[in-house]
């Protein structure tokens, strides 16, 4: 097996003119630009593309997080011979910069010291424009997640509008969508051979802009940018056409008119076969961030992946809110056992390896092969059909034996103490396996105290719109997990990922979920609101209010208050959420749940707040601040001056939160009566 020795690589690719000259280079062939700090690890797209081009014999420089106020950083190496390959980063720059509430984030795990601000908003577009400004005559190939998900006209959550393809906005010559290795190598070879970029229009896995007279002979067309920006039904229909043509076997060329020109999406590139994946992951990565970041606090994103191994790509899970099916695709491919074991063996020789491999996984850890034989001949099913939801397809091939053999080999390596699985297990696929050997060994050897799983919700309607299996499947998995953990003598826990406000999720659904969590003694710490990122079916539903496969209306919670109520219900047990939880339960006429879901501490706080609101006068000032004054009932007129008010500490004029006295503690008997009143409120109705 090539590169199966214990060699640890230490040489980074050039990041400056001085690095070039140290290698004796006068000119680079290509510059690879990335939105993340330079981390030479195969979990980072910039590292894969730059090492792949290096392996093809090209002179490569890496321009990581260039200064974006002008184009001078793009001239750092001098003019490259053939062009630029640009990516926005591992995470969409807008998701990296803003929370789902559109609040700016201060942190960025992919930047030096974990600090935000090192990349611009919409970094893929900004970097492309700067490269074109620096060298207008050089080709720019734009790839990566951010570009892939914006290749068609798309709804932009942050501007709350529909934008044209990133090909139009950025000015890139070619958009490379998907994982990109095949496209990168072919484009580089053709540019190096002297072919003009304008004629490179037939590469699978790429998009380009052209005029009507130069469209390909055969294609399927979806509604254009102006149409989908003004007609939500047209947007939903276009979404279905795009999703139905992302398979390498059954997909067709898709055309969509933008402002003036037409976007042409060629069929997706073929996934890398096993030996090709092995080759990519055997490239000489240093597996660490560049030393220039050491004094800045390093790059936090390396912590979890430095001693993790990617064993597969693609996911046939088909979650509607997930970007993987539009980027990596639904066909699963995987590396050979020898390749994975060789990478693990190399890790054991690294100086800071402590014996723990954090993960052997991928988009879904326990997928190793395509979901069925039919897809190899006819392609993946279209029309919104899922391999695993609402039930497991009868054609599904369920087999964990190959994955299990790999885990056994790695955990037997000298120097390896534990091998964990942290990238997520698809529990419905696991439960479909009649052989529970993998499940037993998962519990025995590969859980680091907690196992991440993603039921996401429990309401049937919401799960259907998510593309997730019914909650009964998760219940069976949960019961078996704890049963096997008990037999193994281990105290281990499930960490369920849950989502609020997904299209289709009503307030009643959120209350149903809170009741489910209470009855199952679950207190999730990791919850999130649905984040409408470009390129997903769920985002289409969020924007249009329609199911793109049926065109039937879908309820979408878009108000800030409604979203806050749904999120609070997921963490009903937190006293800080008491007011929102009580309000939600009253709105849904489920007051019977108040004494169960709302802690006594939270109920008392809500009662005190209500009493204060009833016994206070509020004056709102012109600057938006307000003053709270006690309502002196029976002690003078409402127009009584401040000087005549009772002695004591007075609210500061204009204070946003005026001080108030702490109420005296009630006798225990009175408090018990109040608690009893909460519990019997439903009966009194």
Segments and roles (model prediction):
Residues 2-27, 37, 236-308:
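N-terminal [4Fe-4S]-dependent radical SAM core
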Residues 19, 45, 64-258, 265-266:
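Glycine-rich beta-alpha loop elements in corrinoid/cobalamin-binding modules
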Residues 32, 48, 67-68, 346-495, ...:
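Conserved SAM/AdoMet-binding glycine-rich loop
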Residues 36, 296-323, 348, 356:
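N-terminal pre-triad scaffold of radical SAM enzymes
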Residues 69, 198-247, 260, 269-272, ...:
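Terminal amphipathic helices with adjacent charged low-complexity linkers/tails
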Residues 92-101, 149-151, 181-186, 210-214, ...:
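Flexible glycine/acidic-rich beta-alpha junction loops that bind and position SAM and/or redox cofactors
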Residues 173, 280, 315, 340, ...:
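Conserved, mostly hydrophobic/aromatic
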Residues 609-614, 618-685:
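Intrinsically disordered, Lys/Arg-rich low-complexity segments
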């Amino acid at each position: 097996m090539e590169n199966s020795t214990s060699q640890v690589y230490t040489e980074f690719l050039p990041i400056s003119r001085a690095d070039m000259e140290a290698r004796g280079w006068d000119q680079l062939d290509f510059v690879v630009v990335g939105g993340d700090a330079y981390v030479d690890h195969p979990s980072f797209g910039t590292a894969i593309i730059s090492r792949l081009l290096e392996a093809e014999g090209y002179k490569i420089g890496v321009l990581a997080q260039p200064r974006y106020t002008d184009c001078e950083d793009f001239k750092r190496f001098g003019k490259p011979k053939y062009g630029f390959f640009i990516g926005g980063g591992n995470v969409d720059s807008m998701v990296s910069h803003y929370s789902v509430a559109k609040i700016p984030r201060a942190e960025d795990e992919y930047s030096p010291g974990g600090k935000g601000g090192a990349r611009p908003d919409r970094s893929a577009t900004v970097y492309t424009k700067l490269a074109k400004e620096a060298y207008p005559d050089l080709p720019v190939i734009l790839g990566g997640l951010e570009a892939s998900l914006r290749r068609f006209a798309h709804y932009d959550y942050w501007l709350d509008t529909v934008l044209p393809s990133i090909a139009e906005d950025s000015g890139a010559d070619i958009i490379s969508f998907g994982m990109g290795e095949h496209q990168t190598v072919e484009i580089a070879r053709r540019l190096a051979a002297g072919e003009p970029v304008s004629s490179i229009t037939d590469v699978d896995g790429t998009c380009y802009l052209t005029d009507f007279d130069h469209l390909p002979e055969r294609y399927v067309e979806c509604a254009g940018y102006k149409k989908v920006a003004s007609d939500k039904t047209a947007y939903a229909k276009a979404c279905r056409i795009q999703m139905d043509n992302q398979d390498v076997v059954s997909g067709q060329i898709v055309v969509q008119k933008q402002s003036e020109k037409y976007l042409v999406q060629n069929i997706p590139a073929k996934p890398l076969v096993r030996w090709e994946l092995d080759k990519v992951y055997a490239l000489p990565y240093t597996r660490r961030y560049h030393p220039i970041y050491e004094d800045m606090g390093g790059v936090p994103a390396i912590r979890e992946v430095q001693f993790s191994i990617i064993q597969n790509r693609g996911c046939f899970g088909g979650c509607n809110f997930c970007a993987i099916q539009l980027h990596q695709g639904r066909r699963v491919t995987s590396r050979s056992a020898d390749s994975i074991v060789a990478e693990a063996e190399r890790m054991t020789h690294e100086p800071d390896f402590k014996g723990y491999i954090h993960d052997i996984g991928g988009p879904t850890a326990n997928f190793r092969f395509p979901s069925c034989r039919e897809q190899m001949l006819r392609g993946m099913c279209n029309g919104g059909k899922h391999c695993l939801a609402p039930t497991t397809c009868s054609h599904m091939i369920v087999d964990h034996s190959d994955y299990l053999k790999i885990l056994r080999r790695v955990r037997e390596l000298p120097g390896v103490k534990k091998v964990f699985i942290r990238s997520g297990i698809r529990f419905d696929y696991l439960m479909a396996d009649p052989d529970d050997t993998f499940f037993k060994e998962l519990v025995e050897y590969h859980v680091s105290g907690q196992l991440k799983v993603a039921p996401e919700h429990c309401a049937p309607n919401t799960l259907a719109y998510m593309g997730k299996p019914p909650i009964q499947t998760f219940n069976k998995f949960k019961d078996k997990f704890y049963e096997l953990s008990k037999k193994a003598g281990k105290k281990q826990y499930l960490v369920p990922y849950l989502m609020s406000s997904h299209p289709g999720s009503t307030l009643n659904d959120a209350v149903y979920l809170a009741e489910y969590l209470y009855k199952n003694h679950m207190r999730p710490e990791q919850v999130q609101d649905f984040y409408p990122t470009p390129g997903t079916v769920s985002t289409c539903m969020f924007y249009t209010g329609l199911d793109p496969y049926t065109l039937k209306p879908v309820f979408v919670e878009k108000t800030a208050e409604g979203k806050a109520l749904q999120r609070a219900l997921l963490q009903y047990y937190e006293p800080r959420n008491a007011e929102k939880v009580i309000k939600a339960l009253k709105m849904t006429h489920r007051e019977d749940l108040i004494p169960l879901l709302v802690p006594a501490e939270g109920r008392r706080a809500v009662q005190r707040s209500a009493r204060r609101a009833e016994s206070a006068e509020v004056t709102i000032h012109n600057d938006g601040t307000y003053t709270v004054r006690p309502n002196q009932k029976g002690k003078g007129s409402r127009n009584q001056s401040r000087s005549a008010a009772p002695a004591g500490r007075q609210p500061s004029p204009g204070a946003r939160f005026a001080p108030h006295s702490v109420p005296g503690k009630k006798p225990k008997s009175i408090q018990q009566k109040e608690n009893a009143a909460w519990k019997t409120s439903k009966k009194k109705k």
